[in-house]
């Protein structure tokens, strides 16, 4: 063996690096166990702060360096944030209001929502249509782009400046998000910009148990504003007039030339009206019987018909508070106050915003204040903004209530003094991200640049708010377009199931290798598997990549790849021994002859893994990461490390009589002369019929699409007692109603076998960008289940807590926005197509014959169609979910990777025989090549199926669908190598297939 020194050096370096990085996990566990012996929590923390691992690394360093666990193993939160590129463009254009710009923005938004695409390109195309003959510089020669865009700039120069500014905004947003998470104290967060998805940032936060806080913190743009306000008495008459107009059927569709006159008349009418004062109170009456409930509903409907606005909004409150409303009515009120009628009736300089917290002066819960802000600038922006804030602290006021104190720079202090001096006796509203946090009365001029945000806050609220302000302002609003929350208890169960499936699969593989290849070769292969796991975990830890349940599956599957390499080598050694060579020569020839097949099969699998890593998100990336590492490590351990050991032993005249078979495997598929090429017409017919059935099933039954492809929310609810999915569907049938009055689509399927775990899916308000919709959906779910006596939790907070299992609770949740669903759909299609194209090209380059590329690609396409077809035929008929989600797409790509591995081995033997017998009969040559690799095919398929069955049975629900798809892929991928790929390659070679004689065909070799 050449280059032994390099192999030994790499092995030693990998060993030392793996020991070093894995040692942090053991150190952390040791320090935790020692700290647990200390009863005082403060003393516990002091002990952890004092430790120094290896004399250098603190306890926090150990936490951050130890092997990280993903959300499904540790619990936590995964979100994808989308930075609003349209808002960035509006900021760059200084919020221009000319028709060309606004129409172009509206058109670009509509096109992006319908078809996706690059928003900047969509906007520029729309602008050229809506403002023909006008240059982009007319819009973007602003203060924000000073030095980059001038009135004389060409459209190309402006586009370049816009794209640069958009990318800068995304980069700044990424930095702000990272700073906020660091201040929150999340250990081992994973924050990354998603390549190829402009404006999207993925954030993984293991161990997070307060998703509501994280949602607020991540989506807050820290857009702080100080506004002058109206008094409530000034605005009440306008709201009464608006209520009357809406009740009389005014829909705002009148002609434009009548608007001015109508507005003037409205103001005169309002001027005559006597302001109506209302006390700030809410009375909530409880009705016990069903008849009272029906009567109450009828009264409410009549009241809303007579007073669409004021039946929902109670006027009064004083200062800037014009009224109060229940949180459930805010959407309907917003629809009225932002309507075309409201634009004609309400003052043009009025801006109505809700309070951030429920009113603290009312006994009723979930009642919010509506504040009246006065626009005093020509641009419509606040007279004082958050860019003047230099510091923010969470403190307590004189009454002991939590507040946030802020300091301003010199310019901000000057403007603040002017603003407070001009508004003595009135309120100044402090607005953050479009909601009013406080609106205190100004008693006198405030100099020195000090201000304070007070309200109905908790200590956590003020701490998060101060951290958000200190982290900096987001250049554009960010919203969560995809979210997954996993409870820690569910994570612990996943760890247990993952470890059990891993250990059982590992033991079965070890037993199988010894059973098929005898003690010494079998144990050598098993030793390589152990080293494989050790190196994989070490490399994974050094990359600070989180280990997930799909990641564990990837590691287990990579063991199958390692076994395949050993099987190829051992089968080759057996062939050389049967040909009469000595042990040393047979081992050398076996490793040498198997190298090309191992290299090609591993590289094609690696191509698939890289595509998974690039196109996948969340669990798919975790699987791809460990699979890629496992493929590389298995190649090194199987091809080089085991060779070192064999060479060492054989050079010392040991293992000279080692056996590579057992009574079980001695004659396995030896001397077989199956005439596979004679069957191609039959097998092609069967394949075509199967394809027709599968395609027909797509049209008749379709596929069970998950929210990854439709958009929506999933809630995995664990009940105290067994329930039926149909019962849940009935209970939730009318519960989720969208803001426009339409029923949301709702579904329920059973998870697991205990009958107590149900996954509820709904597309309720999935198009809405409001941060309150998530809480609304969870509240609706709780109320519906509570009313049906299916859960006994006393509050929605307890129901949302994944650790409070008694009484029923949400143990995990997922949200996928519609834009993400479209991107996932297109990404899935592109990733599969790209994988097929990449493999086609690689096979063409390596085998230098298009026949092998065509044969493998057609067979791979059939493999993918077969797996998808079975999912279409079987969903709803098997006792586990067969939904099409991102994990399933990962399974399809993995099937492609495994299947091409098998085909490459067969094609490699055909290529070898073609070189040995260039003028031999092609039909006999193909048959002989397939027969010669049958033993390897059976051993590899069997060992891989053992692994997959362990994952499917023991690995848990989250990867059962994945493993089932892989089982189908292994079975049909193996068959397609023999009955589709090889005959197709033979046909494309251009040789006419001759009918074989009935008698035995002599083997080519």
Predicted regions and their residues:
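Cytosolic juxtamembrane regions of multi-pass inner-membrane proteins
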Residues: 560-604, 647-655, 872, 878-940, ...
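Small-residue-enriched core segments of transmembrane alpha-helices in multipass membrane transport
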Residues: 12-15, 522-544, 555-562, 623-638, ...
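Non-transmembrane, solvent-exposed regions of membrane trafficking/translocation machinery
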Residues: 22-31, 49, 65-77, 81-433, ...
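Pore- and gate-forming transmembrane helices of large, multi-pass membrane proteins
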Residues: 177, 489-509, 561, 581-617, ...
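Interfacial helix-loop-helix hairpins and adjacent transmembrane helices
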Residues: 1-21, 26-67, 90-128, 156, ...
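Juxtamembrane "pre-transmembrane" interface segments
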Residues: 204, 448-452, 460-507, 780, ...
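Hydrophobic alpha-helical transmembrane segments of membrane transport and translocation systems
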Residues: 531, 538-539, 575-596, 600-687, ...
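Interfacial segments of transmembrane alpha-helices in multi-pass membrane proteins
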Residues: 2-4, 404-405, 409-424, 428-429, ...
């Amino acid at each position: 063996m050449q280059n032994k020194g390099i192999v030994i050096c790499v092995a030693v370096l990998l060993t030392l690096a793996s020991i070093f990085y894995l040692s942090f996990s053991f150190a952390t566990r040791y320090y935790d166990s020692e700290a647990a012996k200390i009863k005082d929590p403060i003393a516990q923390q002091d002990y952890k702060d004092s430790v120094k691992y290896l004399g250098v690394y603190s306890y926090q360093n150990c936490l951050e360096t130890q092997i990280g666990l993903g959300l499904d193993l540790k619990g936590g939160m995964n979100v994808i944030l989308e930075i609003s590129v349209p808002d960035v463009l509006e900021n760059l254009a200084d919020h221009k209001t000319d028709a060309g710009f606004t129409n172009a923005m509206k058109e670009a938004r509509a096109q992006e929502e319908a078809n996706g695409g690059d928003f900047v390109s969509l906007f520029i195309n729309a602008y050229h249509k809506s403002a023909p003959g006008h240059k982009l510089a007319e819009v973007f020669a602003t203060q924000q782009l000073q030095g980059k865009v001038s009135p004389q700039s060409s459209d190309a120069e402006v586009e370049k400046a816009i794209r640069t500014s958009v990318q800068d905004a995304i980069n700044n947003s990424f930095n702000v998000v990272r700073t906020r998470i660091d201040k929150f104290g999340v250990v081992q967060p994973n924050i990354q910009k998603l390549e190829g998805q402009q404006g999207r940032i993925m954030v993984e936060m293991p161990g997070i148990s307060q998703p509501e806080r994280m949602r607020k913190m991540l989506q807050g743009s820290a857009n702080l504003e100080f506004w002058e306000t109206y008094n409530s008495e000034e605005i009440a008459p306008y709201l009464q007039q608006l209520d009357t107009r809406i009740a009389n059927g005014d829909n705002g569709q009148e002609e434009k030339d009548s608007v001015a006159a109508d507005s003037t008349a409205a103001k005169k009418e309002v001027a005559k009206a006597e302001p109506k004062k209302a006390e700030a109170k809410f009375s909530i009456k409880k009705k016990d019987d069903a008849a009272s409930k029906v009567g109450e509903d009828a009264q409410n409907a009549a009241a809303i018909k007579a007073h669409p606005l004021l039946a929902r909004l109670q006027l009064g409150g004083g200062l800037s508070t014009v009224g109060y409303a229940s949180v459930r009515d805010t959407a309907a009120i917003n629809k009225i106050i932002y309507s075309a009628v409201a634009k004609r009736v309400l003052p043009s300089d009025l801006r109505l915003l809700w309070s951030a917290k429920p009113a603290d002066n009312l006994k009723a819960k979930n009642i919010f204040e509506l504040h009246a802000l006065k626009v005093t600038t020509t641009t419509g922006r606040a007279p004082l903004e958050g860019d003047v804030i230099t510091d923010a602290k969470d403190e307590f006021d004189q009454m002991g209530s939590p507040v946030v104190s802020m300091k301003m720079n010199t310019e901000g202090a000057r403007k603040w003094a002017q603003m407070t001096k001009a508004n003595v006796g009135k309120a100044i509203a402090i607005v953050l991200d479009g909601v009013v946090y406080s609106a205190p009365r100004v008693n006198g001029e405030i100099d020195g640049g000090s201000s304070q945000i007070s309200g109905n806050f908790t200590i956590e609220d003020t701490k998060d708010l101060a951290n958000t302000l200190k982290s900096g302002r987001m250049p554009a609003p960010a919203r969560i377009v995809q979210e997954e929350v996993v409870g820690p208890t569910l994570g612990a169960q996943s760890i247990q199931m993952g470890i059990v499936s891993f250990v059982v699969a590992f033991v079965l593989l070890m037993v199988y290798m010894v059973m098929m290849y005898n003690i010494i070769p079998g144990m050598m292969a098993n030793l390589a598997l152990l080293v494989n796991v050790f190196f994989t975990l070490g490399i994974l830890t050094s990359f600070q990549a989180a280990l997930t349940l799909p990641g564990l599956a990837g590691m287990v599957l990579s063991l199958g790849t390692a076994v395949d390499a050993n099987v190829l080598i051992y089968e080759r050694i057996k062939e050389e021994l049967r040909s009469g060579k000595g042990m040393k020569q047979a081992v050398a020839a076996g490793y040498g002859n198997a190298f090309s097949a191992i290299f090609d099969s591993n590289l094609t699998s690696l191509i698939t893994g890289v595509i998974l890593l690039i196109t996948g998100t969340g669990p798919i990336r975790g699987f791809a990461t460990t699979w890629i590492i496992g493929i590389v490590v298995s190649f090194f351990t199987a091809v080089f490390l085991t060779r070192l050991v064999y060479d060492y032993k054989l050079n010392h005249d040991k293992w000279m009589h080692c056996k590579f078979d057992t009574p079980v495997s001695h004659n396995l598929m030896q001397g077989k002369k199956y005439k596979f090429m004679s069957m191609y017409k039959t097998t092609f017919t069967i394949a075509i019929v199967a394809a027709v059935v599968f395609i027909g099933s797509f049209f008749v039954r379709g596929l069970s699409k998950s929210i990854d492809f439709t958009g929506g929310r999933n809630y995995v609810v664990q009940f105290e007692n067994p329930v039926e999915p149909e019962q849940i569907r009935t209970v939730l049938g009318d519960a989720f109603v969208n803001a426009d009055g339409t029923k949301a689509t709702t579904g329920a399927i059973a998870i697991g076998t205990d009958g107590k775990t149900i996954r509820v899916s709904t597309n309720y308000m999935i198009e809405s960008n409001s941060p309150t919709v998530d809480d609304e959906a969870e509240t609706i779910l709780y109320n519906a289940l509570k009313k049906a006596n299916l859960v006994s939790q006393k509050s929605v907070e307890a129901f949302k807590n994944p650790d409070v299992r008694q009484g029923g609770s949400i143990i995990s949740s997922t949200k996928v926005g519609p834009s993400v669903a479209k991107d996932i759909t297109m990404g899935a299609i592109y990733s599969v197509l790209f994988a097929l194209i990449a493999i086609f090209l690689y096979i063409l380059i390596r085998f230098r014959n298009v026949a092998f590329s065509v044969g493998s690609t057609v067979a791979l396409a059939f493999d993918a169609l077969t797996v998808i077809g079975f999912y279409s035929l079987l969903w709803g008929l098997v006792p586990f979910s067969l939904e099409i989600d991102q994990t399933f797409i990962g399974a399809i790509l993995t099937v492609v990777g495994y299947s091409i591995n098998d085909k490459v081995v067969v094609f490699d033997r055909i290529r070898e025989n073609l070189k040995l017998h260039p003028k031999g009969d092609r039909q006999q040559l193909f048959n002989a090549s397939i027969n010669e690799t049958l033993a390897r095919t059976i051993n590899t398929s069997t060992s891989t199926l053992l692994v997959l069955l362990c994952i499917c049975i023991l690995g848990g629900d989250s990867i059962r669908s994945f493993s089932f798809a892989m089982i189908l892929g292994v079975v049909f991928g193996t068959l397609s190598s023999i009955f589709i790929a090889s005959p197709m390659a033979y046909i494309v070679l251009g040789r006419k297939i001759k009918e074989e004689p009935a008698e035995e065909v002599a083997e080519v070799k």
